[in-house]
UniProtKB/Swiss-Prot annotation:
CDD domains: AlaRS_core (cd00673). It comes from Haemophilus influenzae (strain PittEE). Catalyzes the attachment of alanine to tRNA(Ala) in a two-step reaction: alanine is first activated by ATP to form Ala-AMP and then transferred to the acceptor end of tRNA(Ala). Also edits incorrectly charged Ser-tRNA(Ala) and Gly-tRNA(Ala) via its editing domain. Zn(2+) binds at H563, H567, C665, H669. This is Alanine--tRNA ligase. Its cofactor is Zn(2+). One of its GO terms (biological process) is alanyl-tRNA aminoacylation. Consists of three domains; the N-terminal catalytic domain, the editing domain and the C-terminal C-Ala domain. The editing domain removes incorrectly charged amino acids, while the C-Ala domain, along with tRNA(Ala), serves as a bridge to cooperatively bring together the editing and aminoacylation centers thus stimulating deacylation of misacylated tRNAs. Its EC number is 6.1.1.7. Binds 1 zinc ion per subunit. Disulfide bonds: none annotated. The keyword tRNA-binding applies. It is found in: Cytoplasm. GO terms for cellular component: cytosol.
Length: 874
């Protein structure tokens, strides 16, 4: 029996033997594709190739692509663990043809791999196929060439209520590449309920789809017209877990070797004995998606991809607690996961320490969140009047505190309270709508600027070149010429202008000819060509014309210094903070650099100083900035890091700075690190959960910044009649003096307030024989208010005191109740009622409670509410 790892390798070996380039799985975070939440299909990394915007040095490819479906249209999360085949994480085996072979070879390759004794050796009589209703070509290949009997070939028409809306017709979007597909099904046998595809019983588990072969042969226009593509392509996908279940003779994916091992390990860790428990399935599935998402740079957070990751982790942890887990357990599955994934586990193994750390921290945080959620639930239940907890509160517990609905229901049942689940479902649906990420490529394929060929980039060595115009675009449309005053995009055959990429801004400058000036404001890539974006201020330009392309050399130079400094900063961060630091984004301009990176903890001032010092040491070392072109495997073997947001071909540009930094980079750089001159960090802060940002400047900009800081220091010293060297000491003296004066003033205020205590006793109001004092005393701290309340309680003997004070734009509330009245009047209940009026909350003992608030303008209302409540309850 083949293991899952052996099946994965045999698939790649088979297609390699058929002339396919074996391409590594891409990240679960799609590169430069904001339309996708996660990589969810094998073709995602080849999207631009299919669109004609990218070229590869091969026309046939095969991959074992890791995928996640837990958001947007492809959302399997709620079914995971409860069905035989739903997963958040799965591997998609695929073979691809980019204008090379088409239907005949694609179908024959699939049949050979599935049925040949040399490969999988599946019984031919167990295989059924579907084709699009009008795809006679595919039908005839299956029937006449391959030999599949007509009774096992099913034509599927437009079964989704629209033209070309069919299980057997695939489209990239509303417009663009599309075409029919053929699907291969495996018949598990009549001992399992279900019917063949297209039948009323097709949702059963007898006939399982194992392979989908898509034939991209049309381009759909905006008006619905289908035009044939000049170079049709093939995109296929086969779920590794599904084919493993078939070959390992089991009916559920959770019974294959990978899941059996993960389930057994989970049971061992949490102390479970029933290996069929669905919670074990949930955890075994979720450790795969969570570990790979973190390895690919996703960090748990409250938005976007991080929010989906957090939901998956918490769902797994919750199921662990259902199984009886008493301590953190989820992260302990990572070593087992790495082992069972074999070669496909290397990316997690490389980040194992960070993966385990983040999983453990998130699980521990969830435990604390559960406690806070219980407190909120207790408070909400105390206010329920009609025996029903609102669905909005239940959803807040779920969404904000990660509180499972069934746990909320258990607590409610103990108090004979039910939940308005319909309202909860409405809130959940509204949240799904807000968070849903479109799974289609939300662009009009036909509106993209597309130009055949490519622009030769000469900017590594030149800032000025003669070049021929190959295309012009005005108002998004291709034109033959433009006139003065028009803004346009100019495509050149060759150019010294750098197009924005890898965080580095595009070059600016101008294009000139006799009597012609085109100001270039930005440079962007459109597929393989460079677009010079700007305005023609003089003359006219036409396709085929030669121009002199001149880059703004000063702006380019300053940008190059900042880009090289970014590499030094990245290396310094990894050396000072740890190898878990990876780039999450950057912006390199001529004025400054911005660098976002993964870092779960705050950076201390000492660490920040160490980082800045280390970068400046490497600048003074004056390392040569060396570039080498090599294949991707050699670059990785050399230890080169890939930069976030960049795409790399088989040949890559490796940038080395001494023995300190080595990265893959296509950007413009300084010749030596010494050219940077000076590196100065301006700000450092968190921009998202687990993501921090450093902004810095270099060269003359850094020197100018230091001069300005010196000027500010000198002016400050002059104002304080000090000098720069003793400025801190002088400020400290002033602060000490100010604190002393403020303390004396506060003491005088408190003394005056205490002296007024006897007046408060005299002015106490009697409510049903109980003495009540409600007063606003501004400028008094909470501590002093407490002392006053205690003193007045003693003077009254029996009574209620409620004080409000405004201090530094904030509200302090203190309520005291003598012991003889606490059965009827509770200080905590009254102070919370007052706090609600001033935007705050609080609590305490029945005889003494405090609260704070942020709305001083509502203090009078808080006093009135207290008086009304006491009138009602005494």
């Amino acid at each position: 029996m083949k293991t899952t790892a052996e099946i994965r390798q045999s698939f790649l070996d088979f297609f390699h033997s058929k002339g396919h380039q074996v391409v590594e799985s891409s990240s679960l975070v799609p590169e430069n594709d904001p339309t996708l939440l996660f990589t969810n299909a094998g073709m995602n990394q080849f999207k631009d190739v299919f669109l004609g915007m990218d070229k590869r040095p091969y026309s046939r490819a095969t991959t074992a692509q890791r995928c996640v479906r837990a958001g947007g249209k492809h959302n399997d999360l709620e079914n995971v663990g409860y069905t035989a085949r739903h997963h958040t994480f799965f591997e998609m085996l695929g073979n691809f043809s980019f204008g090379d072979y088409f239907k005949q070879d694609a179908i024959n390759f699939a049949w050979e791999y599935l049925t040949s004794p040399q490969w999988l050796g599946l019984p031919k009589e167990k295989l059924w196929v579907t084709v699009y209703e009008t795809d006679d070509e595919a039908y005839n290949i299956w029937n006449k060439e391959v030999g599949v009997p007509a009774e096992r070939i099913i034509r599927i028409g437009d079964n989704k209520s629209a033209p070309y809306a069919s299980d057997n017709f695939w489209a990239m979007g509303d417009t663009g590449p599309c075409g029919p597909c053929t699907e291969i099904f495996y018949d598990h046998g009549d001992h399992i309920w279900g019917g063949p595809p297209g039948s009323p019983e097709e949702d059963g588990d007898r006939y399982i789809e194992i392979w989908n072969v898509v034939f991209m042969q049309f381009n759909r226009l905006a008006d619905g017209t289908m035009e044939k593509l000049p170079r049709p392509s093939v995109d296929t996908g086969m779920g590794l877990e599904r084919i493993s279940a078939v070959l390992q003779h089991v009916n559920s994916n959770y019974e294959i070797d990978i899941f059996k091992t993960l389930i057994a390990k989970t049971a061992e860790i949490v102390g479970a004995t029933d290996l069929t428990n669905k919670s074990l399935r949930v955890i075994a599935d979720h450790i795969r998606s969570c570990a790979y998402l973190i390895a690919d740079g996703v960090i748990p957070s409250n938005e976007g991809r991080g929010y989906v990751l957090r939901r998956i982790i918490r769902r797994a942890v919750r199921h662990g607690h259902l199984l009886g887990a008493k301590e953190s357990f989820f992260y302990k599955l990572v070593p087992t996961l790495i082992d069972v994934m074999a070669e496909a586990g290397k990316d997690v193994k490389a980040k194992q320490t960070n993966v385990e750390k983040l999983l453990r921290l998130e699980e521990e945080q969830f435990a604390r969140t559960l406690e806070r959620g219980l407190s909120l639930l207790d408070e909400a239940l105390s206010q329920v009047k009609d025996g029903i907890l609102s669905g909005e509160v239940a959803f807040k517990l779920y969404d904000t505190y990660g509180f499972p609905l069934d746990l909320t229901a258990d607590v409610c049942r103990e108090r004979n309270i039910t939940i308005d689940e319909q309202a909860f479902d409405r809130e959940m649906e509204a949240q799904r709508t807000r968070a849903q990420a479109a799974s289609q490529f939300g662009v009009d394929y036909n509106s993209i600027i597309r130009v055949d060929g490519e622009t030769k980039f000469e900017g590594y060595t030149e800032v000025e070149s003669q070049a021929k115009i190959t295309a012009l675009f005005y108002d998004g449309k291709s034109v033959e010429s433009i006139e003065a005053g028009q803004s346009a995009v100019v495509i050149l055959e060759n150019t010294p202008f750098y197009a924005e990429s890898g965080g580095q801004i595009g070059d600016s400058g101008y294009l000139s000819a006799q009597g012609v000036t085109f100001n270039v404001k930005d440079t962007q890539k459109y597929g393989q060509v460079f677009g010079h974006i700007g305005e023609l201020t003089q003359g006219s330009l036409k396709v085929g014309q030669s121009v002199n392309a001149i880059v703004d050399a000063k702006r380019r130079h300053n940008t190059s210094l900042n880009h090289s400094a970014t590499h030094l900063l990245h290396a310094a961060l990894r050396q000072i903070l740890g190898l878990h630091v990876v780039q999450k984004g950057s912006l390199v301009s001529d004025k400054a650099l911005r660098f976002d990176f993964a870092q779960p903890e705050a950076i201390t001032k000492e660490q920040l100083t160490q980082i800045e010092t280390l970068v400046n040491q490497k600048i003074r070392a004056n390392f040569p900035v060396q570039t080498d072109i090599m294949d991707i495997d050699s670059a990785k073997a050399k230890g080169a890091m890939a930069l976030f947001g960049e795409k790399y071909g088989d040949k890559v540009r490796v940038l080395t700075m001494g023995d300190f930094s080595i990265e893959l980079c296509g950007g413009i750089h300084a010749k030596r690190t010494g050219d940077i001159g000076l590196f100065k960090i301006i700000t450092e802060n968190a921009v998202a959960a687990g993501i921090r940002r450093i902004e810095a400047i270099t060269g003359q900009n850094a020197i100018d910044w230091l001069h300005n800081q010196q000027r500010i220091l000198t002016q400050s010293a002059d104002l304080l009649k000090s000098d720069v060297n003793t400025l801190v000491e002088k400020i400290q003296q002033l602060q000490d003096k100010t604190k002393k004066v403020e303390k004396e003033l506060q003491g005088l205020k408190e003394k005056a307030a205490m002296q007024a205590g006897s007046d408060f006793v005299k002015s106490a109001v009697k409510i049903n024989g109980v003495s009540v004092i409600t007063q606003q005393l501004d400028g008094i701290e909470t501590k002093s208010l407490r002392v006053m309340v205690d003193d007045l309680k003693n003077q009254l003997g029996s009574g209620v005191i409620a004080f409000a004070s405004i201090l530094d734009e904030k509200v302090n509330l203190v309520v005291g109740v003598t012991n003889d009245l606490t059965a009827k009047i509770k200080a905590g209940e009254l102070v919370n009622l007052m706090a609600q009026q001033v935007g705050g909350k609080g609590g305490g003992r029945p005889d003494m409670a405090m609260a704070g608030g942020s709305q001083p303008e509502n203090v009078a209302q808080a006093i009135k509410v207290a008086q009304d409540w006491l009138n009602k309850n005494l």
